[in-house]
């Protein structure tokens, strides 16, 4: 309530005399930041404080509030109160930096240090530290590891790292973690090289947008585990029982669950990343996703920890995933029927496909379905058709330069003549 009241009062014209009340409410918000859904809400608080200070002829305060808001000036076109952030050098983060303890004193989750999550587990005997995944870049892995040791100086040395899959953001920090003394032992799925090759051959246009200018594909190329796993494997690390479970999908072909059965914890990696595989490379296994959900429900973990903070927040429990599986199977049937009917992809999206039982299901399953729907349609469509699509995409090969041409010039170059093309009253061209 204070957030909305302060934000609205700060924007009212001066004749309403609400500036002081706005200052008080915004100051309360800044002082009680831990009560906000996420720290992204403070951006608008600081921005409105900056505008109030500027109007009160307090330029130094205005500049400080503006700096805290993250905006460049006092003319921002849109208000952002999201948890995520973008940085040219370090890339995307889903949430502000924080360290939490899903199991106090035993399991540490490091969020917001880069694109992916870091997890560390203190072994049952207290003598070894277990890591889950290696992060995106050596510098971010170093920052996260040092932050953990500053936060919990009594944790033991890192001895073991289990890698859930060989995507860029889960192996790119390998060179830092492998440089520690003593050197940790790395475990991965036996077919990790297949996924690594797929990642290394991906178009380069996207990687730095996600992972920042500091990202270097050479860091991904350096990844080489000490032990590979091709079947369900159980071992003990410092007395902690660990089950390594190869999974059939759905993001990558080399997925590996890290299960701590005695603690009821499952480190799930990115098996249910909404894109169903990175959207800019050919991967993703929808049936594998459904089969992997069955594995989760069979294991029935008390804690389900994913490779990215929003996944942990959204895909929360085996019960929710079981409901989601039913909804996704229905969606696949609808998409496949539409493809056989010859519908173009845009029409399938516009159909607003909603399972009959969705509205009666748990709200968590509703949100999860809506989050996945667009990308499941895209992936299934991509994997079900050839290079000639129903809307004739792929029949003609147009470059960016072609798209930049005027319609008439492009029409003539593709074989049309001037008498074949005419302009209607509303400006459209008809043949």
Label the model's feature ranges.
Residues 70-80, 340-431:
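C-terminal regulatory/interaction regions
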Residues 1-4, 21, 34, 41, ...:
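Structural signature of alpha-solenoid helical repeat junctions
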Residues 149-234, 255:
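Active-site HxH/HxHxD metal-binding segment of metal-dependent hydrolases
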Residues 96-151, 256-260, 264-269:
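Conserved beta-strand hairpin/beta-sheet module of binuclear metal-dependent hydrolase folds
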Residues 27-31, 47, 51-54, 59-76:
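TPR/TPR-like (Sel1-like) alpha-helical repeat modules
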Residues 102, 120, 228-262:
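Core dinuclear metal-dependent hydrolase active-site scaffold
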Residues 287-347, 353-374:
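Divalent-metal (often Zn2+) His-rich catalytic cores of metallo-beta-lactamase-fold enzymes
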